[in-house]
């Protein structure tokens, strides 16, 4: 297929990154379709209360996911891109750091539970889920394939993993009529399954994990670079997942658990395409880094084009979901119908998520790692404060409103910081379609 010529990109590079991004998209969309279908029949089987227990428990453990990941993924890609001959050292060091962090998170989650337990939820559920942080350490192989612009292998692993996961849950629902605890095991197994798949694919491509090695100085370098992103990631986890927990705890055991189970379906649809900016930015990040190094003017153009693309994609998605929300809940049992108007509000936060992902890579490229912590921390504080204010009177709708405002606040905080204000203005131009109209009138 002949690709159109786009200013700022040479044709060969464009084709390479277009194909890579397209493959990632296919993999994620295929996985998404499988996951959404699975989530619908699992939610209809568990009903709001049990679904609330599962969603609140996973949200609780997710708060520690950033600590387990150490915020290393972007830096691993960057290191592999700059020093490809040090592949085994970079991957080995990163794997040891992430697996150690995953192990440490297990007792940390236990200590957190002693101080802040969730009402009417057994710790055994939390304990099982706490192993997901350890299993996610294997995603260093994902970073390797990203750096090589070989996303077809990531796609293959994800689709295979999701098909197997869907089959397991199908059996639990329709054959075994399983209890809730088995779905907890299944969720944890999902993470392990994909992680093992990455390793098998890595070995299949002629690589071996047994050649990996650890470098103490590299470990220090990575941790020094990533600690702001660790804290930032924790803050992201807080303002992405704390709403589910607060909804349950503020509204009380029975009402709160059912509300969180219903709200989980909102979040699933609203955040369904949040992988798109991650895929696009992950695939284009090497090209953006090259432009920053070789041609500052092209670098700025690529950033503006990226912000424009994020707005157009997220705007189309938000409009579609907002209009289709009543139809979406036709697939659910009547117990979930109250979530339809909540989804129509919550989905508008995706615009700021898309822009936030794109601007986050800009911050990394420019070395403004600490700012990622500042802005996400700000968003988390806004989200928590608004949840306390709105949930008692508005319930799920209050949570949705708080989330949208928090996403907006976190993304556009950079406009108030002098050294990042130009990029904040670029995002505003994209948000209000100013940049798009400028391009139209220049033709």
Predicted regions mapped to residue ranges:
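Signature of the first transmembrane helix
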Residues: 3, 13-73, 106, 110, ...
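Membrane-interface junctions at transmembrane-helix termini in multi-pass inner-membrane proteins
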Residues: 79-84, 134-158, 181, 347-375
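Helix-loop junctions and terminal segments of transmembrane helices
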Residues: 39-40, 68-85, 206-207, 266-300, ...
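Interfacial/gating helices of multi-pass transporter permease domains
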Residues: 38-63, 123, 180-181, 185, ...
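Interhelical loop/hinge segments that connect adjacent transmembrane helices in multipass membrane
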Residues: 1-17, 152, 180-184, 198-240, ...
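Transmembrane helical elements of multi-pass membrane transporters/channels
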Residues: 20-35, 160-161, 165, 186-198, ...
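Interfacial segments at transmembrane-helix termini and the short loops linking adjacent helices
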Residues: 10-14, 113-129, 251-258, 304, ...
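Hydrophobic alpha-helical transmembrane segments
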Residues: 126-130, 155-204, 378-382, 396-420
């Amino acid at each position: 297929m002949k690709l159109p010529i786009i200013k700022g990109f040479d044709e060969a590079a464009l084709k390479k990154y277009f194909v890579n991004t397209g493959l990632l998209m296919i993999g994620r969309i295929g996985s998404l379709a499988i996951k959404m279908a699975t989530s619908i029949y699992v939610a209809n089987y568990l009903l709001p209360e049990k679904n609330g227990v599962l969603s609140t428990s996973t949200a609780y453990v997710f708060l520690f996911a950033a600590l387990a990941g150490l915020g290393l993924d972007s830096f691993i890609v960057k290191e592999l891109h700059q020093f490809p001959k040090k592949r085994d050292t970079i991957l080995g060091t990163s794997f040891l750091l992430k697996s150690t962090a995953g192990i440490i998170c297990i007792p940390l989650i236990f200590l957190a539970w002693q101080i802040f337990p969730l009402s009417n939820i057994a710790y055994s559920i939390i304990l099982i889920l706490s192993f997901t942080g350890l299993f996610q350490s294997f995603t260093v192989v994902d970073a390797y394939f990203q750096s090589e612009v070989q996303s077809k292998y990531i796609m293959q692993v994800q689709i295979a993993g999701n098909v197997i996961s869907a089959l397991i849950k199908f059996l639990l629902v329709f054959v075994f009529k399983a209890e809730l605890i088995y779905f907890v095991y299944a969720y944890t197994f999902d993470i392990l399954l994909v992680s093992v798949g990455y390793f098998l694919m890595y070995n299949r491509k002629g690589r071996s994990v047994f050649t990996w090695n650890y470098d103490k100085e590299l470990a220090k370098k990575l941790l020094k670079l990533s600690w702001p992103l660790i804290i930032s990631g924790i803050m992201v986890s807080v303002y992405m997942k704390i709403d589910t927990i607060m909804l349950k705890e503020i509204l009380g055991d029975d009402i709160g658990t059912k509300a969180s189970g219903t709200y989980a379906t909102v979040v699933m649809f609203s955040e369904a395409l949040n992988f798109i900016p991650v895929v696009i930015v992950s695939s284009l990040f090497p090209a953006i880094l090259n432009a920053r190094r070789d041609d500052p003017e092209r670098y700025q153009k690529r950033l503006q084009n990226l912000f424009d693309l994020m707005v157009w994609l997220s705007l189309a998605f938000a409009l579609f979901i907002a209009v289709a929300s009543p139809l979406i809940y036709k697939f659910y049992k009547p117990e979930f119908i109250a979530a339809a108007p909540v989804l129509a509000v919550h989905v508008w936060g995706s615009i700021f998520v898309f822009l936030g992902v794109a601007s986050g890579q800009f911050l990394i490229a420019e070395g403004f790692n600490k700012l990622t912590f500042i802005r996400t921390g700000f968003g988390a504080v806004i989200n928590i404060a608004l949840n306390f204010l709105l949930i008692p009177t508005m319930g799920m709708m209050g949570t949705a409103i708080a989330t949208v405002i928090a996403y907006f606040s976190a993304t556009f905080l950079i406009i108030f910081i002098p050294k990042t204000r130009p990029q904040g203005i670029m995002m505003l131009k994209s948000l209000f379609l100013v940049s798009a109209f400028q391009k139209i009138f220049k033709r």
